[in-house]
Amino acid sequence: MRSIFITVLLGGVALLIASSCATVPKEPLASGEVRLLSTEVLGSGIRANSSFAVNIFFEAAGNPRIKRACFYEPGEEPSCFNVSYVTLGTKIAFQVQLPGINTGPHRVECYAEYIRDGETRKTNVIATQILVGY
């Protein structure tokens, strides 16, 4: 009886792991839409209370005009910053200069505001971990 329980339990765990790794197909972007993909913190280490740059990679249908990027920790109000530049090379990204934050790990979420059909729209939200040293 115990071996059957363990077999069923291990099968359930394997199924849970397999389903959590499954990718969800992305819907195609509508004309003028922007979808954030990932972030990259620049530099070899972030020091407490020192500004730092973040690249935000995205995909877009057309040539979007990104107004600003907004960052927040869960439960806090977003702080929005102007986009420094947009790169349209093999990887599409824009860069934002962020002010210094306190020492420790931070789970930061980000979205961007962009112009589509003459209106300001918000992208999807992506999250990243930022570890700030002394």
Predicted feature locations:
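Solvent-exposed loop/turn segments flanking beta-strands in beta-repeat/beta-sandwich domains
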Residues: A61-P74
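C-terminal motif of bacterial Sec signal peptides marking the signal peptidase cleavage site
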Residues: I17-S20
